[in-house]
Amino acid sequence: MARLEVPEREILPEWLTGFVDGEGNFSIVTVEKKSSDAPSISSYKVWLHFQITQHSRDTDLMERIATFFECGGVKKRNIDAVDFKLNKFEELENIIIPFFQKYPLQSAKVLDFLAFVEAANVIKSKTARQWTPE
């Protein structure tokens, strides 16, 4: 059976917020690094990651989302999945966070977003070097 062609439509901010509510992910990634000189001392590398995953048949949609945000990239994960990914701090801080502050998430995912924003504020602050995960 042939797949029906879906007409390309303008991506509206409210639609995109709802889409991310269901399909998006806000991650805070930490990696511990032990000091070779003092094994009892650890440092942490922390970065933020925003991602939307879809079936590979929706690659065009993911590329339109990347165009909408004017940042990030689309990458095929495997034969069946494609990701819109973004982890550049400046783009997260200047594009993604303000977007979801203007067009708030409606599901429990808003709690993930609020933690994401808090982590961004810590990373941006001068005390980021002293931050330890709880």
PLM segments and residue spans:
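Sequence-level preference for short, compositionally simple segments enriched
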Residues: 1-134
